[in-house]
């Protein structure tokens, strides 16, 4: 009887975790070695307009043709082979997924700036057959940095003019 209660508790905990993954304000995508999409959370659904059922088992590149397969495979290679994380920062590449900026009132940016982390998902056998992508919205930070840089330019121009 005690084992049955533990099993029920484990099932409930599993459902809570899945629920959190769906609702968190971060994009989560799980890819296999062929870059087929295995998981697509609510953040990705709401920003891409694509349901999990539409993208599951399709390659990332068939859903997002702007993503260059060779470039992405090069980024993912050490994640699969060395079990290390890889990073794509908005300062180097503003976005991977061209999502609209969903804060059009407060933001002047037309698209969402993103930081992306690729992480290995180690299976029970110890091999990495899947990787996760975590997509963070960096638009507010990017916009703030751009505004600060513009102010610094204006300030230095004013100083040069002797104002």
Describe each model-derived feature in a short phrase.
Residues 81-129:
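Per-ARNT-Sim (PAS) sensory domains and their PAS-associated C-terminal
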Residues 8-47, 161:
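Sensory modules in modular signal-transduction proteins
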Residues 120-161:
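Sensory coupling linkers of modular signal transduction proteins
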Residues 2-16, 150-153, 157-163:
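Short, charged amphipathic alpha-helical "coupling" segments at sensory-output junctions
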Residues 54-73, 81:
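PAS-family sensory/regulatory domains
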């Amino acid at each position: 009887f005690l084992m049955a209660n533990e099993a029920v508790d484990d099932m409930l905990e599993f459902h809570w975790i899945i629920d959190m993954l769906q609702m968190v304000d971060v994009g989560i995508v799980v890819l296999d070695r062929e870059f087929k999409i295995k998981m697509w959370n609510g953040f990705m659904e709401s920003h891409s307009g694509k349901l999990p059922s539409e993208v599951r088992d399709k390659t990332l590149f068939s859903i997002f043709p702007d993503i260059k397969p060779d470039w992405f495979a090069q980024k993912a290679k050490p994640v699969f082979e060395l079990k290390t994380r890889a990073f794509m920062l908005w300062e180097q590449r503003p976005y991977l997924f061209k999502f609209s900026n969903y804060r059009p009132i407060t933001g002047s940016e037309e698209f969402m700036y993103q930081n992306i982390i690729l992480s290995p998902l180690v299976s029970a056998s110890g091999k990495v057959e899947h990787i996760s992508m975590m997509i963070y919205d960096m638009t507010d930070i990017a916009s703030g940095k751009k505004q600060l840089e513009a102010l610094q330019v204006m300030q230095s121009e004013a100083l040069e003019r002797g104002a």
